[in-house]
């Protein structure tokens, strides 16, 4: 499933420089489990892309991604439990931001995504363009 405009050239804009950066093994394992190892992986990565571009609340994410609100909330819970996003606020309109773990480990996240894509090697089964 190629990603829509949420991920194109937003989160991985410096991808050309990633080949020279060493991948963190712990982060590789974490990203592998969250973004490739369980159901909802595409949704979680799309959420990361969306909030990296513009931090927003769950309702706005639901509309922007054209997904059910409960689906968004479940994915947000998984991302929060793994400290990959930060919640600001105390209620329905909470705004979500990517954590420092995401921003400081983009090359590792990119490596995980590309490794899975290489295993899939099927047309139409891409995380990112």
Predicted regions and their residues:
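Amphipathic alpha-helical dimerization/coiled-coil segments
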Residues: 2-30, 101-129
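Short capping segments at the starts of secondary-structure elements
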Residues: 40, 53-57
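N-terminal positioning helix adjacent to the helix-turn-helix/winged-helix DNA-binding module
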Residues: 40-43, 94
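Pre-recognition alpha-helix immediately N-terminal to the DNA-recognition helix
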Residues: 45-49
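A short acidic, leucine-rich amphipathic alpha-helix
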Residues: 60-64
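Alpha-helical DNA-recognition elements
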Residues: 78
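Glycine-centered, phosphate/nucleic-acid-interacting loop/turn motifs that mediate DNA/RNA or nucleotide
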Residues: 82-83
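Short, Lys/Arg-rich nucleic-acid/phosphate-binding segment
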Residues: 89-96, 101
């Amino acid at each position: 499933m190629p990603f829509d405009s949420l991920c194109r050239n937003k989160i991985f804009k410096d991808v050309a420089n990633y080949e020279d950066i060493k991948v963190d093994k712990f982060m590789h394992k974490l990203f592998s489990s969250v973004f490739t190892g369980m159901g909802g992986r595409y949704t979680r990565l799309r959420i990361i892309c969306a909030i990296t571009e513009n931090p927003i609340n769950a309702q706005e994410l639901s509309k922007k991604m054209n997904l059910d609100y409960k689906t968004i909330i479940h994915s947000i819970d998984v991302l929060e439990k793994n400290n990959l996003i930060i919640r600001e606020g105390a209620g329905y309109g909470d705004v979500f931001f990517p954590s420092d773990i995401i921003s400081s480990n983009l090359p590792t996240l990119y490596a995980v995504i590309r490794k899975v894509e290489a295993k899939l090697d099927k047309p139409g089964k891409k995380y990112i363009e």
